[in-house]
Amino acid sequence: MVKLAIDMMGGDDAPGIVLEAVEKAVNDFKDLEIILFGDSSQCTLEHDRVEVRHCTESITMDDEPVRAIKRKKDSSMARMAEAVKSGEADGCVSAGNTGALMSAGLFIVGRIKGVERPALVVTLPTVSGKGFVFMDVGANADAKAEHLLQYAQLGNIYAQKIRGIAEPSVCLLNIGTEAAKGNSLTKKAYRLMEDQHDFNFTGNVEAKGLMNDVADVVVTDGYTGNMILKNLEGVAKAMGKMFKSTLLSSFKNKMAALILRKDLNGLMTKMDYAEYGGSVLLGLNGTVVKAHGSSSAKAFYSAIRQAKIAGEQEIVKTMKETVGTENE
């Protein structure tokens, strides 16, 4: 049985989409228990495997992250993180303030001993629909080469345990594929990754090749990763608008869109971030999943499923044994 703590109040459309996603999750997974943290008066869900714990505070998107976590002790997010820290819950999911959730992860759940910098990881779509693990996308703007090496180790475990890839290929994001390319950070990181035997390092990858299935895991610093992620989101939205405008521009195009509707829906599903769940803060003493702030019920459900798999696969235990220093 896996038990997850859920922030009922986080996100643009909470608690509605959260309750819808939780209801579907407990109905689909008979080995899942949920603790919902939030305003109990707004909870309309009743289920024998769902417990509701009333919180008098909530953290908004406008709150200063660290201050909010430290001052709002009875917020749904802080209480949720405490449940993970105490071991009562195997993991947690929130669509709330990203910075606050990262602060809750660091200051409440805590880092795995030996992990210098936790990293924020996402799974992004590729042309084949397989997707790839990408990190760090914003947990740390600055990074040392040793941090990138740890990111690669964490990402390798994530790809194995969560995505079911037996021997993931791991690449370093760079301005060229040659080993000598890049700045001092990427050159040193390349040497460190090349010298290790913990994962299958296959070299550098350029940004233009990210979505072409060249690697299962791609590693970079949080500053670069966050810009890449936001650029991909922006391009995807712009292309969607252009595509829609073209399809609706004439009767001929509208007829073509009608004929191709099933194929177009399949393409959109392949590229839909909701299929892959949320972003995960790796390197902590518990699973912390961040669903998108504007998540639909479908996207939040995927994030719950993601956290459940992490609990089943004991991903935190594996990271402690592989990357951590607790057993040394």
Curated annotation (Swiss-Prot):
The protein's Enzyme Commission number: 2.3.1.274
Pathway given in the UniProt record:
Lipid metabolism; phospholipid metabolism
InterPro entries membership? FA_synthesis, Phospholipid_synth_PlsX-like
Q: Which GO terms describe its biological process?
A: fatty acid biosynthetic process; phospholipid biosynthetic process
Task: Please provide the record's keywords in A-Z order.
Answer: Cytoplasm, Lipid biosynthesis, Lipid metabolism, Phospholipid biosynthesis, Phospholipid metabolism, Transferase
Q: Which reaction does it catalyse?
A: a fatty acyl-[ACP] + phosphate = an acyl phosphate + holo-[ACP]
Task: Give the Pfam families listed for this entry.
Answer: FA_synthesis
Main enzyme class:
transferase
> What terms describe the molecular function in GO for this protein?
phosphate:acyl-[acyl carrier protein] acyltransferase activity
Where does this polypeptide localize? Answer: Cytoplasm
Q: Name one GO cellular component term.
A: cytoplasm
What's the superkingdom here?
Answer: Bacteria
Q: Which PANTHER family match?
A: FATTY ACID/PHOSPHOLIPID SYNTHESIS PROTEIN PLSX, PHOSPHATE ACYLTRANSFERASE
Subunit notes for this chain? Homodimer. Probably interacts with PlsY.
The record's family statement is: Belongs to the PlsX family.
Chain's role: Catalyzes the reversible formation of acyl-phosphate (acyl-PO(4)) from acyl-[acyl-carrier-protein] (acyl-ACP). This enzyme utilizes acyl-ACP as fatty acyl donor, but not acyl-CoA.
Classification via HAMAP family: PlsX
Which protein is depicted?
Phosphate acyltransferase
Gene name for this UniProt entry: plsX
